[in-house]
């Protein structure tokens, strides 16, 4: 979608390499991956999980991952390993839990502790591995990651002329 990690990544690649890849914004990944399989798209960028129909049918080949190697795709290099230099290619693109701002801090802390504790559960480990997801971080770790990466997102968005949607 507009201003998503995939959108910014495409624009950063265009900027660095003088390309003219046109981002096409879909309402979800399923129709995008379907478009790739049908041949109406030349390339697509999204999550490993949603790409499974493409990967399993051999109708698409992964050629890059964002900033961190993916165990399920050990031969696929990251964009920085392939020469991409934007700071944006160092962000993790994490998914986080959110609560209303008025939630008392002890409740936030307790829920964060429970989420981190769940990382040890064998069923949770299996789900994380299946969907190629990282274990949940604690509240302080998540906040530190957010504070570190937000300026990078904002710098990329500003330099690319993106406006909030």
Predicted regions span which residues?
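Conserved, function-defining micro-sites of small-solute handling proteins
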Residues: 1-165
